[in-house]
Amino acid sequence: MKKPGIPSDRDAFGHQVWAYFKDHGSPAEIVERDDGFVSFSENTAWYFGDVRRWSASERQAIRLARGHRALDVGCGAGRVALHLQERGFDVTAIDNSPLVVKTAKARGVRDARLLPFERITQLEPDTFDTVVMFGNNFGLFGSRARARRLLKHLHRITRNNALLIAQSLDPHQTNEPAHLTYQRRNHRRGRLPGQIRIRIRFHEFVGPWFDYLLVSQAEMSAIVNGTGWDVDRFLTEDGPRYVALIRRV
């Protein structure tokens, strides 16, 4: 049987996070889009930051986490899970990167699992009171259709009045010609403008291609509508990033 998650030799993001954890260096993050656009940043430390280093909207949103059981989707190095554990939550943290999960466990996340997002159907129904998708991880839904399907799965594994706290980035807030051209191409293909296909590179490791979904607030509201969830409000800051508070109905 095929193991879940990304094979080690293609786990570029996992190797990046593990290298930072072991060496306390600052390895660069390289993201390649399928049109050839490449972005470069040295923000790996961000995946390890405690709550004092989070954005204002993240800090405001996480204070609203409710209940006792929480699910951290795309947990990375465990910054969200560790914070919620400190507050007394029973946290399940999931990621599709073996080395990311190894890092999260090494940092003290008690229940970190190698579980791709699309396999959340394996989790017990009526379990979680809060679901967190920080780090622009609304993007892990990948596409409009996949988002609606997975939101319904999230509904099944959450309890009454559960709260989904999800961060995204409005792709329309850009003047970058390459991004605007990409969005027009998406429109011609019947995709949302912010549905991008990317892969991660780190040293000799090249990750698999995957779809990542960036949406405006209006686009998010339309996606969520009719899935058993409803956007309660948005927490915004200067710039394109925002956090949505989405309630189970």
Regions found by a protein language model. Name each.
Residues 1-31:
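N-terminal auxiliary segments of SAM/dcSAM-dependent transferases
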Residues 17-19, 159-221, 225:
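SAM-dependent methyltransferase
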Residues 51-68:
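Conserved alpha-helix/loop element of class I SAM-dependent methyltransferases that forms part
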Residues 68-76:
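Conserved class I S-adenosyl-L-methionine
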Residues 97-98:
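Conserved SAM/SAH-binding beta-strand->alpha-helix loop
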Residues 108-119:
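Conserved SAM-binding strand-loop segment of SAM-dependent methyltransferases
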Residues 128-148:
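A short SAM/SAH-binding and catalytic strip from SAM-dependent methyltransferases
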Residues 147-160:
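A short glycine-rich, Lys/Arg-flanked "PGG" loop and its adjoining helix->strand segment in the class I
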